[in-house]
């Protein structure tokens, strides 16, 4: 069949026929990204020159080993698909890589530049293909890349691998300054809580509620490096990463401790600005409270000098301590210790005056009863009975009647009442009664 085709074109040699077929095939099936047109022409000329030097070519002979020379075939037969050219239907490198990890919304699609290239924590696929999330927009972590060449796993399989708490999680903003790290880590902890990872966050005692898994540690490591670039990390964070670049849990634990310290600092400042003292508590306790607050603030970098501390203390004084505001307000070099010496002096004076007073306060009802008993005991009625009297059969009524009749009868004894009021009155009656004037 081949000899018949060649006999129809006697003026064309076998080599040139092969070259023409090859040129046609390369032109129609060439990959536009492979080689340029000038290179193809050079390859065609070299192939034509090599084939023209051959005298005879049998029909069943093998094709010369030329990577750009295809075997002579009819034009209708397509070229082989397993040739050396990269075909357009082949998968790209990004498509051949795994579509991502099977947890927490495919973290492989998150962009980051690792601090250290570790095979264990290196992301799958080239980093240049990862989409960049803007810091102001909460782009879901499971959002596929907008590039047309990337094809990831369908959403149904991704949903089954994600946690059931929230399908879309707003990522934290990008860290742009070391001074913003305390505020940024708060948003990052919130991001972990929304990603169903609240159990691995260290508590107040520095220990998490549950043990972190390897996949969760990988996710923690990758997301931390994505949104917190190394050039914007504080020095103490870099020191931790220099020892172990995967110890993100230690960074979170230290951050929580610093948050608590910041809260304590705020509470100390509020307490110092709202001090109140009127002597109701011991001066020693008040001094200890104030000095401890000032020492804590100074140790945490918030320096309170003597002038500011004295102003805050004197502003809260009241009662007898209030005059300290005016006696020493012009002394610029007054220290906190000197101010507390004055406070102690006033407190001790108050305690001394209180100790000099009687401790027991008399009840008004008791004072009334005591006054009655006092008159009865100091000025009692003097009644001297006659010891020789044997008959006491008269009633009290009769005796009282005799006393009244004897008082009404005029006698020399009654005149003695007007003469002297200090001497006892002696009534000459049978009862022999002696009464003082004050008892009437």
From Swiss-Prot:
Composition-biased stretches (Basic and acidic residues): 429-440
Record-level GO cellular component terms: cytoplasm
Localization: Cytoplasm
Main location group: cytoplasm
Phosphoprotein listed as a keyword: yes
Alphabetically ordered keywords of this record: Cytoplasm, Phosphoprotein, RNA-binding, Transposable element
An annotated Gene Ontology molecular function: RNA binding
Ranges annotated as biased composition (Polar residues): 1-10, 48-60, 127-152, 419-428
Nucleotidyltransferase in keyword set: no
GO biological process, alphabetically ordered: viral translational frameshifting
Renumbered residue ranges of the record's region Disordered: 1-93, 126-173, 352-440
Induction, as annotated: Ty1-DR5 is a weakly expressed element. Induced under amino acid starvation conditions by GCN4.
Pfam families the record matches: TYA
Stretches the record annotates as RNA-binding: 299-401
Subunit structure: Homotrimer.
Misc note: Retrotransposons are mobile genetic entities that are able to replicate via an RNA intermediate and a reverse transcription step. In contrast to retroviruses, retrotransposons are non-infectious, lack an envelope and remain intracellular. Ty1 retrotransposons belong to the copia elements (pseudoviridae).
Protein name: Transposon Ty1-DR5 Gag polyprotein
Organism annotation: Saccharomyces cerevisiae (strain ATCC 204508 / S288c)
């Amino acid at each position: 069949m081949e000899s018949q085709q060649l006999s129809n074109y006697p003026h064309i040699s076998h080599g040139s026929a092969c070259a023409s077929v090859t040129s046609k095939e390369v032109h129609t099936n060439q990959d536009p990204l492979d080689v340029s047109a000038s290179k193809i022409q050079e390859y065609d000329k070299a192939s034509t020159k090599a084939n023209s030097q051959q005298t005879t070519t049998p029909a069943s002979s093998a094709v010369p080993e030329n990577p750009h020379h295809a075997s002579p075939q009819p034009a209708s037969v397509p070229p082989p698909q397993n040739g050396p050219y990269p075909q357009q239907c082949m998968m790209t490198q990004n498509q051949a890589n795994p579509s991502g990890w099977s947890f927490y919304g495919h973290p492989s699609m998150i962009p980051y530049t690792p601090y250290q290239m570790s095979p264990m924590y290196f992301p799958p696929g080239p980093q240049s293909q990862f989409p960049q999330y803007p810091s102001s927009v909460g782009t879901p972590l499971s959002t596929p890349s907008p590039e047309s060449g990337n094809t990831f796993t369908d959403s149904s399989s991704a949903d089954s691998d994600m946690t059931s708490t929230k399908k879309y999680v707003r990522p934290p903003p990008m860290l742009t300054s070391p001074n913003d790290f305390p505020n940024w880590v708060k948003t990052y902890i919130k991001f972990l809580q929304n990603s169903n990872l609240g159990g691995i966050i260290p508590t107040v005692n520095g220990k998490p509620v549950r043990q972190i898994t390897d996949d969760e540690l990988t996710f923690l490591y990758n997301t931390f490096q994505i949104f917190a670039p190394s050039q914007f990390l504080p020095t103490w964070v870099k020191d931790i990463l220099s020892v172990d670049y995967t110890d993100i849990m230690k960074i979170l634990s230290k951050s929580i401790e610093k948050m608590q310290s910041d809260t304590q600092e705020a509470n100390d400042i509020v307490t110092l600005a709202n001090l109140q003292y009127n002597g109701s508590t011991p001066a020693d306790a008040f001094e200890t409270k104030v000095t401890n607050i000032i020492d804590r603030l100074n140790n945490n970098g918030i320096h309170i000098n003597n002038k500011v501390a004295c102003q805050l203390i004197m502003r809260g004084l009241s009662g007898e301590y209030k005059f300290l505001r005016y006696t020493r307000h012009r002394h610029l070099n007054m220290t906190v210790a000197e101010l507390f010496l004055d406070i102690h002096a006033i407190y001790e004076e108050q305690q001394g005056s209180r100790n000099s007073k009687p401790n027991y306060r008399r009840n008004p009802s008791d004072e009334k009863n005591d006054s009655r008993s006092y008159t009865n005991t100091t000025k009692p009625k003097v009644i001297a009975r006659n010891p020789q009297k044997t008959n006491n059969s008269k009633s009290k009524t009769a005796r009282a009647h005799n006393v009244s009749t004897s008082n009404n009868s005029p006698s020399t004894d009654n005149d003695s009442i007007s003469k002297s009021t200090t001497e006892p009155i002696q009534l000459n009656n049978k009862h022999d009664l002696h009464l003082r004037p004050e008892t009437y």
